[in-house]
Amino acid sequence: MKTALILLCILGMASAFSMKNFHRRIKAEDSEENGVFKYRPRYFLYKHATYFYPPLKRFPVQGGSDSSEENGDGDSSEEEGEEEETSNEEENNEDSEGNEDQEAEAENATLSGVTASYGVETTADAGKLELAALQLPKKAGDAEGKAPKMKESDEEEEEEEEEENENEEAEVDENEQVVNGTSTNSTEVDGGNGPSGGDNGEEAEEASVTEAGAEGTTAGVRELTSYGTTTAVLLNGFQQTTPPPEAYGTTSPPARKSSTVEYGEEYEQIGNEYNTAYETYDENNGEPRGDTYRAYEDEYSYYKGHGYEGYEGQDYYYHQ
């Protein structure tokens, strides 16, 4: 009995101490001061209880409850809503039938705004894929009725684009023949093997123009070479020349002379003379600055023999 009483006393003291400490901890956390300055969320419940989470705040949704149900007229309001929906559908069907022509014109306008890139052959599938983003969602019946119209408009646009591409390619070929006729396309024009070889009259005119241009360029090349300039190969009808140095009044730098200095009879040192003309200074008597320490001795000779602590406070800044 004595041992049992002793054990009970010890257990009661331990439990009282632990509970006192537990209540003190909760009181400290719930105090007004700690709630403002020392916010520590209570994690011991979430640590030991796996699925214990604080309750979520439920905000009331504005306009979510039906006013008709509150008044007790829910059935009548639903019937009225169904009647309004049916009447609206009938009106929309009539408007859609009346406005088919206007929508088709608007679609053609929007489709013509998008054109294929230059140099890429357009096909029906590619055109449909590119213009899929511009097509508005329609009903199944409208889509079936407008399918032939869409196909016709697509075919017309493809034909126009092909004609424009052909015209642009023809213009580009003509420009290339005029520009590069002196160097590359002279044989093609004579033989009639160019991209537009069907028109013989135009080829003859282009050949005469290119011959005249070739004569002018050869004469200019001869004149330039007679003056001593170097001419490059004609690139796209343009000449690349380098002007003579006398035009800018510049002279080439003198070549360095190699000298051989004999050091006794053992070996010879062969190299270029070191020209120090560009490194000379008037105050250094023609010697390059930095080879010796003499230039720096004059600047730092004041500090020889004593350190920075000998200036006695701020006297150094007032007696410079």
Swiss-Prot record:
<dbReference type="GO" id="GO:0045785">
    <property type="term" value="P:positive regulation of cell adhesion"/>
</dbReference>
<feature type="modified residue" description="Phosphoserine">
    <location>
        <position position="96"/>
    </location>
</feature>
<feature type="glycosylation site" description="N-linked (GlcNAc...) asparagine">
    <location>
        <position position="180"/>
    </location>
</feature>
<feature type="compositionally biased region" description="Basic and acidic residues">
    <location>
        <begin position="139"/>
        <end position="152"/>
    </location>
</feature>
<dbReference type="GO" id="GO:0031982">
    <property type="term" value="C:vesicle"/>
</dbReference>
<dbReference type="GO" id="GO:0005576">
    <property type="term" value="C:extracellular region"/>
</dbReference>
<keyword id="KW-0325">Glycoprotein</keyword>
<feature type="modified residue" description="Sulfotyrosine">
    <location>
        <position position="316"/>
    </location>
</feature>
<feature type="glycosylation site" description="N-linked (GlcNAc...) asparagine">
    <location>
        <position position="185"/>
    </location>
</feature>
<dbReference type="GO" id="GO:0030198">
    <property type="term" value="P:extracellular matrix organization"/>
</dbReference>
<keyword id="KW-0091">Biomineralization</keyword>
<dbReference type="InterPro" id="IPR008412">
    <property type="entry name" value="IBSP"/>
</dbReference>
<keyword id="KW-0765">Sulfation</keyword>
<comment type="subunit">
    <text>Monomer. Interacts with integrins; the interaction promotes cell adhesion.</text>
</comment>
<feature type="compositionally biased region" description="Polar residues">
    <location>
        <begin position="249"/>
        <end position="261"/>
    </location>
</feature>
<feature type="modified residue" description="Phosphoserine">
    <location>
        <position position="76"/>
    </location>
</feature>
<feature type="modified residue" description="Sulfotyrosine">
    <location>
        <position position="317"/>
    </location>
</feature>
<dbReference type="GO" id="GO:0007155">
    <property type="term" value="P:cell adhesion"/>
</dbReference>
<dbReference type="GO" id="GO:0030282">
    <property type="term" value="P:bone mineralization"/>
</dbReference>
<dbReference type="GO" id="GO:0005178">
    <property type="term" value="F:integrin binding"/>
</dbReference>
<feature type="compositionally biased region" description="Acidic residues">
    <location>
        <begin position="153"/>
        <end position="176"/>
    </location>
</feature>
<keyword id="KW-0597">Phosphoprotein</keyword>
<keyword id="KW-0964">Secreted</keyword>
<feature type="short sequence motif" description="Integrin-binding motif">
    <location>
        <begin position="289"/>
        <end position="291"/>
    </location>
</feature>
<protein>
    <recommendedName>
        <fullName>Integrin-binding sialoprotein</fullName>
    </recommendedName>
</protein>
<feature type="region of interest" description="Disordered">
    <location>
        <begin position="60"/>
        <end position="117"/>
    </location>
</feature>
<dbReference type="Pfam" id="PF05432">
    <property type="entry name" value="BSP_II"/>
</dbReference>
<keyword id="KW-0130">Cell adhesion</keyword>
<keyword id="KW-0732">Signal</keyword>
<dbReference type="GO" id="GO:0001503">
    <property type="term" value="P:ossification"/>
</dbReference>
<dbReference type="GO" id="GO:0036094">
    <property type="term" value="F:small molecule binding"/>
</dbReference>
<dbReference type="GO" id="GO:0005615">
    <property type="term" value="C:extracellular space"/>
</dbReference>
<feature type="region of interest" description="Disordered">
    <location>
        <begin position="136"/>
        <end position="225"/>
    </location>
</feature>
<feature type="modified residue" description="Phosphoserine">
    <location>
        <position position="77"/>
    </location>
</feature>
<feature type="compositionally biased region" description="Acidic residues">
    <location>
        <begin position="67"/>
        <end position="106"/>
    </location>
</feature>
<keyword id="KW-0730">Sialic acid</keyword>
<feature type="compositionally biased region" description="Polar residues">
    <location>
        <begin position="177"/>
        <end position="188"/>
    </location>
</feature>
<feature type="modified residue" description="Phosphoserine">
    <location>
        <position position="153"/>
    </location>
</feature>
<feature type="modified residue" description="Phosphoserine">
    <location>
        <position position="31"/>
    </location>
</feature>
<comment type="function">
    <text>Binds tightly to hydroxyapatite. Appears to form an integral part of the mineralized matrix. Probably important to cell-matrix interaction. Promotes adhesion and migration of various cells via the alpha-V/beta-3 integrin receptor (ITGAV:ITGB3).</text>
</comment>
<feature type="glycosylation site" description="N-linked (GlcNAc...) asparagine">
    <location>
        <position position="108"/>
    </location>
</feature>
<feature type="region of interest" description="Disordered">
    <location>
        <begin position="238"/>
        <end position="264"/>
    </location>
</feature>
